[in-house]
């Protein structure tokens, strides 16, 4: 019997963001179920790692603490202290999930030089905006596969902001991506640009979270609901007044409790119905048991669909959500005003599931081709 191929995944697995950790979990899980031996490599971009280290920190190294900046600095520290208990709980929940579900107990952080020593049969770069220099404080060679010459590397659903590459950065991409055996990205727009730069075929694929079905996430959920009564769930990836108003109106009309999930507690956010310390498991459990969901998040939308919920995505501009809704013929779930809601409207998830299944199949075929050929 042939030994399983060893796959090393490089992504933003250590970011304390529901989408970031769940996409990493999904890609690793899918590859293992496809018969490979997948492992998330514990390489952490220094800048991103610093953002999520434990403890309150102020960017002294930026020289942001000139006397003219003291007011802003103390305001930021004050807001952090205000939500310190919740932030610590959230930090602990994310670190537990990352350690147990993503890294399988790995503790050593890998350097660029360490990556070659992992001796993987294939290295997969992605998903997420791993090619965004503004996120990694300059291009990070690890996410472009610039290590272990001669080892096979492919990308999966890699991305950049707005799906476009500034002209000044195109020469770097042209050179850096030449070493990849196969390339896939998140956006069609980006695919065309990368094809032109590299001369390679570039495939668009689903977000890794969509590679799995609802049942594949069951092991992450709490058995019992976190809220006993019926509730509307509102998830804010960024604060938005309209999103809050839509969720409040729906809860009032339907007579349900409103539960809001926010990333950070501030003095402006005060309600017993607001949650600030949820980890990935809590996030998914809140979605599973909600009667209806309101969100301005791509992954909030994704999991609303996977868990076959009534939902509304509330935003002004978000190409990523809009593209997903258009592909699944769910454009009516995007609203920009309170009076656009129809509480009786259901969703034909049979049709949605069929389209999703086909798209998922194409992405799995890309992975098989990328690994085996």
Model-predicted regions and their roles:
Residues 1-373:
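Active-site anion-handling motifs in enzyme catalytic cores
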């Amino acid at each position: 019997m042939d030994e399983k191929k060893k796959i090393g995944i490089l992504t933003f697995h250590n970011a304390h963001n529901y989408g970031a950790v769940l996409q990493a979990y999904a890609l690793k899980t899918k590859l293992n179920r496809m018969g490979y031996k997948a492992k998330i490599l514990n390489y952490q971009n220094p800048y991103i790692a610093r953002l999520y280290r434990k403890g309150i920190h102020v960017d002294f190294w930026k020289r942001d603490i000139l006397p003219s900046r003291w007011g802003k600095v103390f305001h930021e520290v004050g807001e952090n202290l205000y939500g310190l208990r919740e932030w610590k709980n959230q930090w602990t929940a994310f670190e537990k999930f990352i350690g147990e579900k993503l890294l399988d107990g790995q503790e050593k952080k890998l350097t660029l030089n360490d990556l070659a020593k992992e001796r993987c049969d294939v290295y997969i770069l992605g998903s997420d905006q791993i090619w965004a220099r503004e996120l990694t404080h300059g291009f990070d060679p690890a996410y472009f596969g610039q290590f272990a010459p001669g080892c096979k590397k492919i990308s999966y659903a890699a991305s950049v902001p707005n799906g476009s590459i500034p002209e000044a950065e195109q020469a770097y991409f042209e050179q850096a991506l030449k070493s990849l055996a196969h390339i896939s990205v998140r956006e069609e727009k980006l695919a065309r640009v990368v094809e032109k730069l590299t001369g390679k075929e570039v495939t668009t694929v689903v977000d890794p979270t969509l590679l799995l079905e609802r049942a594949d996430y069951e092991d992450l959920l709490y058995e019992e609901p976190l809220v006993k009564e019926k509730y509307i769930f509102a998830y804010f990836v960024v604060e938005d007044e309209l999103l809050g108003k839509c969720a409040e109106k729906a809860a009032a009309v339907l007579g349900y409790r409103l539960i809001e999930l926010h990333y950070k507690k501030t003095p402006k956010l005060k309600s017993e119905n607001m949650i600030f310390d949820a980890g990935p498991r809590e996030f998914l459990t809140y979605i599973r048991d909600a009667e209806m969901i309101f969100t301005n998040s791509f992954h909030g939308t994704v999991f609303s669909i996977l868990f076959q919920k009534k939902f509304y995505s509330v935003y002004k501009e978000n190409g990523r959500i809009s593209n997903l809704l258009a592909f699944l013929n769910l454009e009516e779930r995007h609203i920009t005003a309170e009076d656009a809601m129809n509480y009786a409207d259901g969703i034909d998830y049979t049709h949605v599931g069929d389209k999703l299944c086909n798209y998922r199949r194409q992405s799995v075929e890309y992975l098989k081709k990328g690994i085996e050929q």
